[in-house]
Amino acid sequence: DPCYEVCLQQHGNVKECEEACKHPVEY
C-alpha cells in the first residue's frame, strides 16, 4: 500500500500508519 509505505518512510510508526491509511490522509 503506497500510503503505508510513505507513512512508514516518513514516520516509522506501524500502528499510526495502519490507522492513518484506513482513511484518506495527507502528508
UniProtKB/Swiss-Prot annotation:
Alphabetical keyword list: Disulfide bond, Ion channel impairing toxin, Neurotoxin, Potassium channel impairing toxin, Secreted, Toxin, Voltage-gated potassium channel impairing toxin
Entry GO CC: extracellular region
Record field: transmembrane: none
UniProt superkingdom: Eukaryota
Tagged with keyword Secreted: yes
Record has Cell cycle as a keyword: no
Disulfide cross-links: C3-C21, C7-C17
Subcellular localization, as worded in the UniProt entry: Secreted
GO molecular function, one term: potassium channel regulator activity
Tissue specificity comment: Expressed by the venom gland.
Family: Belongs to the short scorpion toxin superfamily. Potassium channel inhibitor kappa-KTx family. Kappa-KTx 2 subfamily.
General function of this protein: OmTx1 decreases the amplitude of the potassium current of the rat channels Kv1.1/KCNA1 by 17% and Kv1.2/KCNA2 by 12% as well as human Kv1.3/KCNA3 by 24%. OmTx2 decreases the amplitude of the potassium current of the rat channels Kv1.1/KCNA1 by 8% and Kv1.2/KCNA2 by 10% as well as human Kv1.3/KCNA3 by 36%. Also alters glucose-induced insulin release from pancreatic islets.
Comment on protein domains: Has the structural arrangement of two alpha-helices stabilized by disulfide bonds (CSalpha/alpha 2(S-S)).
Name this polypeptide is given: Potassium channel toxin kappa-KTx 2.2
